Amino acid sequence: MIMSIMKKTLFLLSLLVLMLSQAVVAQSVRQQLLSRLQQLQVHGYMFGHQDDPFYGLTWQWERGRSDVKETSGDYPAVMGFDLGGIEMGDEKNLDSVPFARIREELLAHHRRGGIVTLSWHPRNPYTGGTAWDNQDTIVVQSILPGGLHHRKFLGWMKNVRNFLSALKDEQRQPVPIIFRPWHENNGAWFWWGAKQCTPREFHALWCMLQDYLLSEGFDNLVWSYSPNLDGNCSEQQFLERYPGDDRVDLIGLDAYQWGTEEDYVQQLNADLKMLTAYAVNHGKLLALTECGLKNLPDPTWWTRVLKPQLDRYPLSYFLVWRNAKHEFFGPAPGEKNAVYFNEMVRSDNVLMLKDIKK
């Protein structure tokens, strides 16, 4: 009798341990990436590049190519891709990149040991225009529960779900992803911008997408909230549209130099100082989620302007936008800025792919 009870007890304990271990595995993908990002931050900040393996300054769609790798000898630690168009069921995204190729390159970079981030520029669900169709103030309202286009947007979110569900490694485990929806929402150029919806509507939009994906089992997403460069934003203003500490893992900043160098440096430091204080006090990661100087008219920009500012803050990574024939933000072989880019990434605190491999 006693032996029988002991056997049953041991069996139940073994079953409980198995269930708990399975639960840990199922819930740990996001946390594993968060822990990895925190550990890497001790060594410096990673370099990232948007659409790195798809096209460059002088080439397009050739497999195995990368302007960054051909310039520096290594891939970026972080690669960024965009899902704009997936909501419509399109075969290609808003930059004409086939979604099948995005999936292929995303998984390849994960296998290399790199980190991937996804943004999403969905079309305007009210007018059918682009993400930059920003003339209406009722678009967000129309897709929230009870809104005219809520059912349509549910279908759009399902298309995002379907793409994300196919991002699995060789062991059929979900690939960890930094997910960065609704970026630059403090600006007024997207239909989800500050002049296009109220803070309450924006919160509801964020929660609707996040709750939907969590309900579908996507616990592999590190959620990034990334407003645009302001230069005069207080913590109170930042918090007006911030979804909340329980909904954000990584605080980002999109910060391009469109004006003078002096203005850029002043604005970048003002915003990063405020965001650093908040991130440190609230246990959040911090990154420059988009940045760059279009076409790099000043080749020394990497080492003379950008890096001295980044060195002042506890950043996880910085990501420059894409290289294309009509515009480029990263290095390319033969360009004058390549020398200064290589000088920057050879610094001990700037991490490329080889520096973060497990």
Regions found by a protein language model. Give the residues of each.
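N-terminal module-boundary/linker segments of secreted carbohydrate-active enzymes
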Residues: A26-V78, G84, K92-S96, L306, ...
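Aromatic-lined carbohydrate-recognition surfaces of secreted/lumenal glycan-active proteins
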Residues: G48-Q50, R180-W182, W206-Q236, G283-P297, ...
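Substrate-binding cleft of secreted/luminal carbohydrate-active enzymes
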Residues: Y45-D51, K284-K358
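Acidic-and-aromatic substrate-binding clefts and catalytic sites of carbohydrate-active enzymes
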Residues: P53-W61, I86-A100, N228-Q236, Y256-N269, ...
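Bacterial Sec-dependent N-terminal signal peptides
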Residues: M1-Q27
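Alpha-helical scaffolding within the catalytic cores
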Residues: Q31-L33, W59-V68, A100-E104, V160-F163, ...
